[in-house]
Amino acid sequence: RDVERSRGLGDVYKRQNYNSAVATFCNNIANDLPIQVNDPSVELELLYIDDLVDEMIHALKGEEHHCEFEGLDVQPKADGRYCYCPVTHKVTLGEIVGLLHQFAEMPKTLMIPEIPADSFAKRLYSTFLSYLPKEKAIFDLKMNVDQRGSFTELVHTLNCGQVSINISKPGVTKGEHWHNTKWEQFIVVSGHGLIQLRKEGTDEVLNYEVSGEKIQSVIMLPGYTHNIINLSDTEELVTVMYCNEIFNPNKPDTYFDKVEK
């Protein structure tokens, strides 16, 4: 009853090109090396090392899970002869490779993959990163620079928009536009600035003075033209900007109109 039968163990310690397809794929894709997949439809049942360790800790506490086996199939049974880990993941070789290519493209696409809590993707991403060569742990971001400062997209998400960082030079005003559906949040993290909003068709201007000394978030409301002004004569204004959608040049939903006429 103290024997634990382990499934294919996926973790950061397996040897690539030796005893694990997952380790081999992670290593080769992380290092831009070729891989070979003879049959993408082949399904593996994988057990992540942390889940195995958690189950072993449960066993030490007398809280192990018991089972019997019918061939290779686990049959949970309270008085079973074997201990087993109930958390495993059935996934095809094609699915594994597809996810790994998404992970590898992230520095180019900025797209954060969907990695729900307790998902196989979350475990695979951590495993993939453990094979990343040290020179790939840092990568450049595309800075859009002009005389006013810079704007740099940091991350994209599939369903929750994007995060960027905006740097404004002293005295500079940026924005002066509004959106129908798109909305944003501006968070000044360094410097001293003024964020202004005005609802289209009205004259009232909302003024929000913000500073890196007190981190606050200001929502750019749909239908409100808005700007951000660096009030300093000497310091740059650094603002983290969240937008609920990724910018689409074919459907920008951006209309220019000064806040103060």
Q: Can you annotate each of these PLM segments?
A:
Residues 151, 175-177, 195-197, 217-220, ...:
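Short beta-strand His + acidic residue motifs that chelate non-heme Fe in jelly-roll/DSBH
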Residues 51, 58-142:
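Mid/C-terminal beta-alpha module of Rossmann-like enzyme folds, strongest
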Residues 201-204, 229-261:
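Double-stranded beta-helix
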Residues 200-222:
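Short acidic-glycine-tyrosine-enriched beta hairpin
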Residues 181-200:
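Glycine- and acidic-residue-biased ligand/ion/polar-headgroup-sensing regions
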Residues 24-47, 67, 75-85:
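A conserved pocket-lining segment of Rossmann-fold NAD(P)-dependent short-chain dehydrogenase/reductase
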Residues 135-176:
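A short glycine-rich, His/Asp/Glu-containing loop-to-beta-strand
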Residues 2-9, 13:
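Single conserved hydrophobic/aromatic residue that forms the stacking wall/gate
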